Regions:
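Short, small-residue-biased leader/transition segments that mark boundaries at the very start
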Residues: 1-3
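Short alpha-helical scaffolding segments that buttress acidic/His motifs in well-ordered protein cores
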Residues: 14-15
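Surface segments flanking catalytic/ligand-binding clefts of nucleic-acid enzymes
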Residues: 19-191
Length: 191
């Protein structure tokens, strides 16, 4: 029922979570991708979206948001200085720029973590990199501001209409009231 009744964003989150925890061996992925059953085309698309590297579900959503808005990103990008020394690893690198976008959860409000974050931000700035931090609220309700930041970093005109693709994906997922209602209706219909 999960594969048949869920949309790509939800399935992508499940795939990424299972991979991150080592619960989805390669042979099982191959089996899932090769068999035909209700929902298998959707599952195959979800595997295409699940590029790996996410350390949280919100990172997955942030990555899918960028890709839906036609922003090329690379997950878990390692940034080095001019000597090749490690500076930081960013959740999402906006390909072709010196900017990373990251999900900032509640852990970043801890005073000790906040000090580490500020030190890291200084290292990034010293090497000419910029960082944009976003919350779950931003991802769900302020996507156009994330897109605006990306457009600015890419040096392209801001087109807020590009966010519509993200809104369409989000609307069908369990991260929206509409997506939750779709699942409730599907469950009721199957009883």
């Amino acid at each position: 029922m999960c594969i048949r009744d869920r949309r790509e964003l939800d399935l992508t989150c499940l795939i990424e979570g299972a991979r991150h925890r080592g619960l989805l061996p390669e042979h099982e992925e191959d089996r899932l991708l090769s068999e035909a059953y209700p929902g298998s085309p959707r599952l195959r698309r979800s595997f295409e979206w699940a590029t790996g590297g996410a350390e949280s579900i919100w990172e997955v959503l942030l990555r899918v948001l960028h890709r839906a808005c036609e922003v090329a990103v690379e997950a878990q990008h390692e940034i080095v200085d001019e000597n090749g020394d490690f500076v930081a690893r960013g959740d999402l690198w906006l390909v072709g720029t010196r900017r990373i976008h990251e999900y900032d959860g509640a852990v970043h409000q801890d005073p000790r973590q906040h000090r580490k974050d500020l030190k890291r931000d200084r290292r990034l700035g010293a090497t000419g990199w910029e960082r944009g931090g976003y919350t779950s609220y931003d991802v769900l309700h302020q996507a156009v501001s994330i897109l605006r930041d990306a457009d600015q970093a890419l040096g392209r005109p801001h087109d807020p209409a590009r966010v519509r693709a993200w809104h369409a994906i989000l609307k069908q997922s369990l991260f929206s009231p509409a997506g939750q209602q779709l699942l409730r209706d599907r469950i009721r219909a199957s009883l």
